[in-house]
């Protein structure tokens, strides 16, 4: 790593990230780009995270990072105050006082090529990738769009694929669950990093064998399967987006002579999981 005089400024790193993930590619409701930080401040170390939360902020401070690159926006919804006694206000004040800049790439990174779903597909060894939902205005064959469709290294049953996905993604309390016939053969798989039930119709139209995403809900899943859609796999939101951190970190290292770290902190909010077992003998009654 070079000295401070030769280090890039925040504006340089932001400009590079904006070229890779243009802000114009973000959804209209999204909030991406530089959230806070002095554009002229030197960047010697970057921490890549899925969520900018108090725990990852403390990681950044302990690592002496100058910039946090986050996937999820800190200020996605309007706030009326960033006073230090509010949740987001505390984060903002902590970062500003510590001279740590914050940059977010969200839906613009989702549709990029390579982007969030490419990283997820890479974890599973998918080949012959193509977008699940091509981006509006993307040139034919460009590869930009939401989600990816690819071929698994070998045909697996849905049950086998569920275990395979769980073994390839970062471990979380939520794990991986599947919907459909466990013996159904799967070779062509669609994936989408993050919440993906909005694209259930696209997965069905694409004719894939199964679709992996996060945050699937009861009624959309039930109706999708009843309508003859592909099998489904549901993983933790954080776990499906965490692979992208490795990709963006490697790219940043290639662009600048700086240290780039990846947070391994699981920011999935779920901390417990128990599988209900029917007809347990001798179940102990819990007194109120």
Task: Label every PLM stretch briefly.
Residues 1-288:
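Hydrophobic structural segments
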């Amino acid at each position: 790593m070079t000295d401070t005089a030769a280090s890039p400024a925040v504006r340089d790193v932001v400009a590079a990230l904006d070229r890779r993930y243009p802000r114009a590619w973000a959804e209209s409701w999204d909030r991406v780009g530089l959230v806070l930080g002095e554009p002229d401040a030197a960047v010697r170390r970057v921490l890549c995270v899925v969520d900018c939360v108090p725990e990852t902020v403390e990681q950044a401070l302990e690592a002496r990072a100058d910039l946090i690159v986050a996937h999820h926006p800190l200020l996605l919804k309007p706030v009326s105050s960033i006073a230090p006694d509010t949740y987001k206000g505390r984060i903002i004040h902590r970062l500003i006082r510590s001279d740590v800049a914050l940059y977010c790439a969200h839906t613009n990174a989702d549709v990029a090529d390579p982007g969030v779903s490419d990283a997820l597909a890479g974890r599973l060894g998918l080949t012959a990738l193509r977008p699940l939902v091509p981006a509006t205005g993307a040139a034919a064959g460009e590869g930009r769009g939401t989600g990816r469709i690819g071929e698994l290294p070998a045909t697996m049953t849905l049950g086998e694929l569920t275990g395979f996905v769980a073994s390839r993604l970062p471990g979380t309390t939520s794990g991986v669950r599947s919907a459909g016939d466990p013996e159904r053969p799967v070779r062509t798989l669609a994936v989408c990093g993050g919440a993906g039930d909005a694209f259930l119709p696209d997965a069905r139209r694409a004719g894939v064998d199964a679709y992996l995403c996060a945050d699937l809900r009861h009624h959309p899943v039930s109706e999708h399967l009843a309508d003859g859609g592909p099998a489904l796999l549901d993983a933790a939101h954080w776990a499906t987006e965490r692979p992208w951190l490795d990709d963006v970190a490697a790219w940043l290292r290639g662009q600048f002579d700086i240290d780039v770290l990846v947070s391994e902190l699981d920011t999935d909010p779920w901390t417990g999981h128990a599988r209900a077992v029917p007809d347990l003998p001798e179940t102990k009654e819990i007194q109120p």
